[in-house]
Structure formats: C-alpha cells, structure tokens
Amino acid sequence: MDSNTVSSFQDILMRMSKMQLGPSSGDLNGMITQFESLKLYRDSLGEAVMRMGDLHSLQIRNGKWREQLSQKFEEIRWLIEEVRHRLKITENSFEQITFMQALQLLLEVEQEIRTFSFQLI
C-alpha cells in the first residue's frame, strides 16, 4: 500500500475521532469503524493482487469474494453519501477539511479496489 494512503487513513481517522458532534457521535463512530474495515479490506485485496498466484487460494478461501466485493462497494457508497451529508451540514472549518479529505480518500480507495478487483477477475 502506498505510504501516503496509509498516512491519509491514519490522519483522517485520528481527526474524526477528535470531533465532537453531539448526538450524532454514534454515527461518527460507525463511520470510523467502517473506514477502518475498508482500509483492512483494501490492504488484503491489494496483497492478493501482488501475489497473483494467490487468486486461486483467495477463491478457495472465500468462495463468495465477489459478493463480499459488492458489499464493500455498497459500504463505500454509503460512506461517500454520509461524508457528503456531513460536509453539507457542518460549519466548522476543521470538520469541513477533514470530511473533504475523507471524501477524496474514499473516492481514491473505491478506484483502487475496482482496479484490484478487475485484476483478480
């Protein structure tokens, strides 16, 4: 994984964890959890691509990997919509910058996962 992507994930997760959004903090914690899960999934998919021979074991280990991939894309779309919504409603510039960076990162990761999945197909 690109070291800039790693630091971007870590930076955004750290910033999001510092935000105080009142009653919606439970939603924010859910977003943080999904961000972390997405990062781990992206890493494992990227590693499988790097070891192209691992495709066979990936399919054996997880016969439903396409279904899982579809689920991850749904999660990404949900996160993108949630981040866009937060971006529209927040007036705090720190939060706006954080959500803008999170949105950009999500779009980049979505593209990377698409690229990885096409290489695996």
Swiss-Prot record:
Chief site of localization: virion
Compartment list: Virion; Host nucleus
Keywords: Host nucleus, Host-virus interaction, Transport, Virion
GO biological process: exit of virus from host cell nucleus through nuclear pore
Locus of motif Nuclear export signal: 12-21, 85-94
InterPro entries registered for this protein in UniProt: Flu_NS2
GO terms for cellular component: host cell nucleus; virion component
Pfam families the record matches: Flu_NS2
Subunit relationships: Interacts with protein M1. May interact with host nucleoporin RAB/HRB and exportin XPO1/CRM1.
Function field: Mediates the nuclear export of encapsidated genomic RNAs (ribonucleoproteins, RNPs). Acts as an adapter between viral RNPs complexes and the nuclear export machinery of the cell. Possesses no intrinsic RNA-binding activity, but includes a C-terminal M1-binding domain. This domain is believed to allow recognition of RNPs bound to the protein M1.
Other noteworthy facts: Average number present in a viral particle is estimated to be 130-200 molecules.
Family per similarity comment: Belongs to the influenza viruses NEP family.
Name under which the protein is recorded: Nuclear export protein
Origin species: Influenza A virus (strain A/Chicken/Hong Kong/YU562/2001 H5N1 genotype B)
